[in-house]
C-alpha cells in the first residue's frame, strides 16, 4: 500500500479531510502530520516539529502537496521530498503553479481527485 504524506497549511482541514478520503478510495495510506497538532504551540518546539515531519516524509512513498495558497512549510516539505527522490504531486486548486512547484512535482493538478489519481498510478 502506497503511503502518502499530506503536505499543506496547518489550518487546511478540508483539504486533509478530502485528501484522506480520496487516498483511502485509491488504496493508499494517508499520513497526516497534523495528527501531531502543534497549532498555537510551535514556539520552542520547532526542532521536534520539523524532525517529525522529515521522518514521516522519509517513511512515505509520495507527497501530496496542497499549493492552493502560499505556505512555507508545504514548500519545504515538497523540496525535501524531491531531494530524497520521493514522488511529489501538487494540488493547485486552479492557481497557476509556481516555477518551483513545477520543478519539484511529478504533476501539478488543478483538482484534488486528479492529484490523487496521479499519485495512485495504474
Go through each PLM region and give its residues.
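Conserved catalytic or regulatory cores that recognize and/or transform ribose-phosphate-containing ligands
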Residues: 1-122
